[in-house]
Curated annotation (Swiss-Prot):
Keyword vocabulary terms for this entry: Cell membrane, Cell projection, Cytoplasmic vesicle, Membrane, Methylation, Phosphoprotein, Postsynaptic cell membrane, Synapse, Transmembrane, Transmembrane helix
Keyword Cell membrane attached: yes
Protein name: Proline-rich transmembrane protein 2
Gene: PRRT2
GO MF entries: syntaxin-1 binding
Subunit text: Component of the outer core of AMPAR complex. AMPAR complex consists of an inner core made of 4 pore-forming GluA/GRIA proteins (GRIA1, GRIA2, GRIA3 and GRIA4) and 4 major auxiliary subunits arranged in a twofold symmetry. One of the two pairs of distinct binding sites is occupied either by CNIH2, CNIH3 or CACNG2, CACNG3. The other harbors CACNG2, CACNG3, CACNG4, CACNG8 or GSG1L. This inner core of AMPAR complex is complemented by outer core constituents binding directly to the GluA/GRIA proteins at sites distinct from the interaction sites of the inner core constituents.
Amino acid sequence: MAASSSEISEMKGVEESPEVPGEGPGHSEAETGPPQVLAGVPDQPEALQPGPDTTAALVDSGPKAELAPETTETPAGASETAQATDLSLSPGGESKANCSPEDLCQETVSKPEVSKETTADQGSRLESAAPPEPAPEPAPQPDPQPDSQPTPKPALQPELPTQEDPTPEILSESVGEKQENGAVVPLQAGDGEEGPAPEPHSPPSKKSPPANGAPPRVLQQLVEEDRMGRAHSGHPGSPRGSLSRHPSSQLAGPGVEGGEGTQKPRDYIILAILSCFCPMWPVNIVAFAYAVMSRNSLQQGDVDGAQRLGRVAKLLSIVALVGGVLIIIASCVINLGVYK
């Protein structure tokens, strides 16, 4: 048994010897035979297993007690050498073998991290996609708004007439003020609502206004006076028309604008000049002045004034002539009678 144990130790040494010098000259074998290195890595548990088996076999069969500890020591050394060779040949393999559970743990840790990152990304995407979702939420909100809008509308509609009611009053007040400023009598407070406001000015007449702006009523009165003057012209107490210069288109002569078949008013200026030779000096001078005024009014188009002034000039000139003739006769009689 001792020989067998020694042989086993030698065989293990021989097996370890080509593996240990793999670092030096026998490195080519390790390089050329990667399957041996790969086979050596899984053989580690096999090298560890025969240790206790051999210890049990040697303890049971071997009568010598010294060999048992030797055999027990040799597998431990063999295992150490095998581990050293494994470390020398494949440092990456040990790291892989030793770190394989750590790598798995790291991978498992990284996987939940990746899953957390993916979940965080998905959550951020969902959050980014989530803001549009509240947009439809205010969509039902406009529904109560139109419902709420019609409610104030009926309240506003009756208020509109109340606001529009003061406008007629304001207009009536403004119209009243304008009428007061325009020298028109304003209406009372309730007249503006009951009926239309009276026109402040009468509608314009179709007839053309006179040259000097005389109203039609005055013209009618002047025409009547002229007719009365013509009827009573021979009587000393006949009413005489006014000496104002008011136009009249009815009495215009053929040579005057507006005259149609009527006689041109005479100014009697020749008669007034003859009366100036009579000894009625103030009267004949006044008659001459009226005759000149009559001609001027006729040139201005005031036919009625020219006719009226001519009539006065005629009367004064006749008085001056008659008076002058009488004075001359009286003076002659007196002078001739005295001398006789």
